[in-house]
């Protein structure tokens, strides 16, 4: 028969907090993950706010989670509440405004680049370019600095947040 050390909530932010046993009975918790890209390092700032009947406690931890990141973008998928003609559109956080109840999904795009320079073909631009998170074409031979002539990989995924969405 399995035994469990803690029967508490399993919700965690991007740095793994709050840990087991950190949430006391009767407390309310807000858990957040804030991602930032500085230079070529993707960082996570995990925050937890504990609300108990007598006090509010905030805990913040940050750490790098990936290196050699050329681009990191998050877009939200908003779906209108029009049952006859539902429409879905992409928006960044500023454009969502007060329409968070219409957010049905989130698209995460991450561009990583290699650590070694590689020989790039010179006769076919299709072999030396990729489509960036914003849809623009990027030629790897025209990049400057530590990204020049390095392989770039684009990872893009859409995560559905609400089951009634049409995405």
List each model region and its residues.
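Extracytoplasmic beta-strand-rich oligomerization domains located immediately C-terminal to a leader/signal peptide
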Residues: 1-61, 66-67, 88, 161
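Short linear sequence signals and composition-biased patches located at protein termini or domain-edge surfaces
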Residues: 26-29, 50-167
């Amino acid at each position: 028969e399995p035994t469990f050390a803690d029967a508490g909530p399993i919700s965690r932010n991007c740095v793994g907090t709050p840990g087991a046993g950190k949430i006391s009975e009767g407390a309310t918790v807000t858990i957040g993950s804030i991602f930032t890209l500085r230079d070529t390092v993707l960082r996570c700032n995990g925050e937890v706010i504990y609300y108990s009947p007598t006090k509010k406690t905030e805990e913040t931890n940050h750490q790098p989670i990936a290196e050699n990141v050329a681009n990191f973008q998050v877009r939200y998928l908003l779906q209108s509440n029009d049952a006859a003609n539902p429409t879905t559109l992409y928006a960044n956080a500023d454009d969502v405004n007060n329409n968070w109840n219409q957010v049905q999904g989130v698209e995460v795009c991450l561009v990583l680049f290699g650590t070694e320079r590689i020989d790039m073909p010179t006769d076919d631009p299709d072999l030396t370019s990729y489509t960036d998170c914003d849809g623009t074409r990027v030629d790897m031979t025209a990049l400057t600095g530590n990204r020049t002539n390095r392989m770039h990989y684009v990872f893009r995924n859409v995560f559905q947040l609400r089951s009634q969405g049409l995405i």
